[in-house]
Amino acid sequence: MSDVERTEFKLPEGMDLSSPPQRNQDVDAAEQQGEHDIERSLRPKSLDEFIGQPKVREQLSLVLNGAKNRGVTPDHVLLSGPPGLGKTTMAMIIAQELGSSLRMTSGPALERAGDLAAMLSNLMEGDVLFIDEIHRIARPAEEMLYMAMEDFRIDVIVGKGPGATSIPLEIPPFTLVGATTRAGMLTGPLRDRFGFTAQMEYYDTEDLTRVISRAARILEVDIDQDAAVEIGSRSRGTPRIANRLLRRVRDYAEVNGDGHIDVAAAQAALRVFDVDERGLDRLDRAVLGALIKGHGGGPVGVNTLAIAVGEEPSTVEEVCEPYLVRAGMISRTGRGRVATAAAWQHLGLEAPEGAIGGTLF
């Protein structure tokens, strides 16, 4: 280890190095069906079942099968991309494909090195450790993770004061799967320790339609193909949103009809839930309205927009803006946010001369 110093920490209270690690209950991706378990029941269980992301699936299959053929644990895996594209599902599939147990945590939960040590000490050989939002891991825990990822060991300090002793703790070989929505916030030393990195991309309407059709079969929902396309086209390129909209349309169809979903039922349901033909919801339209009607199309700072719509700046910046920028409705400039011609047109207004061009996808 050349780029970081050796990390030492105090042994967490209750950790006994003399006792073998006890296996926790495995994470099971298939649980009983119930309204609160629907999201889990819709998760694919293998790379073959996973819809979309063909390049990632091909590359990951090579990594996993190569490791299995050699009888070793695969390299650590970093999955990056916007929320809702299947990073957690992919981690579950990796464990399933390897026949291993999956241990799950998140970056914000690892505030101290001892938090990570407690989890690492319970790993069994071949386990998959999934850290969601890994870019938010605390620095002391991150530095310990360097040694664990490279050398499968960490150093612990037993005792206090002058009598404290540093003891190396060997960790069984494991595979770390990290997920992040902000790959740029990862430090170089952490990023470099992942042997395989993959960027999850937004879905097109065709793949989202397949996602919806698969979910409808699992949920035993009677839906026309055209209705599935209609829902998919409003799902913002995100499978999680597609599945959520399907469930809301199902509710509408069951309450107001016989449960069958055709295009008319899908359109009516999505109107009730304030999702327009391009997938924009109430907050998205409020942001566009504040930008165009309140400030003549901009440029406007994000703080001003947030005040206008009654939300936190982080909500506008992280929830609304990514899709509005992708949809060609907002342009981010050095002076602030500017509405494009497509945004004016979407609100039924005539774009002023000189408005930035933008096309809906």
UniProtKB/Swiss-Prot annotation:
Give the domain note.
Has 3 domains, the large (RuvB-L) and small ATPase (RuvB-S) domains and the C-terminal head (RuvB-H) domain. The head domain binds DNA, while the ATPase domains jointly bind ATP, ADP or are empty depending on the state of the subunit in the translocation cycle. During a single DNA translocation step the structure of each domain remains the same, but their relative positions change.
Question: Which stretches of sequence are listed as region Small ATPAse domain (RuvB-S)?
Answer: 204-274
Species per Swiss-Prot/TrEMBL record: Corynebacterium aurimucosum (strain ATCC 700975 / DSM 44827 / CIP 107346 / CN-1)
GO terms for biological process, alphabetical:
DNA recombination; DNA repair
Q: Which UniProt keywords apply?
A: ATP-binding, Cytoplasm, DNA damage, DNA recombination, DNA repair, DNA-binding, Hydrolase, Nucleotide-binding
Q: What is this protein called?
A: Holliday junction branch migration complex subunit RuvB
**Where does the protein end up?**
Cytoplasm
Query: What's its catalytic activity?
Result: ATP + H2O = ADP + phosphate + H(+)
